[in-house]
Amino acid sequence: MKRGLFIVLEGIDGSGKTTQARLLARWFEDNGFKVVLTKEPTDTEFGKIIRKLVLEGSIIDGGRISLEAEALLFAADRAEHVKKIIEPALREGKVVISDRYFYSSLAYQWARGLNLEWLIEINKFAPHPDIAILLDIPPREGIKRIKKRSSQTEFDKLFKLQEKVRENYIKLAKMFDEIKIIDATKSVEEVHREIISSIKEIWGKNYGSR
């Protein structure tokens, strides 16, 4: 049995990752493939802790945790994700589509001041995907899409972070050959077609006729 195909979708908030992941999963299923659609943070216990951190501003039991501890929690969740979901599915020849992966940790936590080399080191265990689609969109458009403009102060704070994260994603695309940048300002249908085209390009190179 051939190893499955591992695809990751990345991008700043509001770039359309979840929508495109679902469309991609449906496309593979319509073409006769078994698909595992997954995400990070996951639904494991580590993932639940991380979701709580995101919602409550990195506070556990009334105390704010360090950025380093937060990064290690993300890595722990990812380790569970790899061992319990990603690797077993790939061994079974399935197509694995992940909405976010370790690139998110690198882009976001680097933007918050952590050392990139250290972030790469603590995520070294994570296998690289066959292709990582980076849905690129200007921060203002992304924020507009997720409707987080309740106040100018909140908008300005979010904009500055997303702007830095976007810059980091572009830098990461130059570091990791598997990252393919796609303009996510286009229509949902156009973006979907470009994703399919990008996947077909690496499909033949890595797998031959499937």
UniProtKB/Swiss-Prot annotation:
Alphabetized SUPFAM superfamilies for the sequence: P-loop containing nucleoside triphosphate hydrolases (SSF52540)
Disulfide bridge map: none
Catalytic reaction annotation: dTMP + ATP = dTDP + ADP
Keywords of this entry: ATP-binding, Kinase, Nucleotide biosynthesis, Nucleotide-binding, Transferase
Cross-referenced InterPro entries: P-loop_NTPase, Thymidylate_kin-like_dom, Thymidylate_kin_CS, Thymidylate_kinase
Entry EC number(s): 2.7.4.9
PANTHER family: THYMIDYLATE KINASE (PTHR10344), UMP-CMP KINASE 2, MITOCHONDRIAL (PTHR10344:SF4)
Official protein name in the record: Probable thymidylate kinase
The organism of origin for this protein: Pyrococcus furiosus (strain ATCC 43587 / DSM 3638 / JCM 8422 / Vc1)
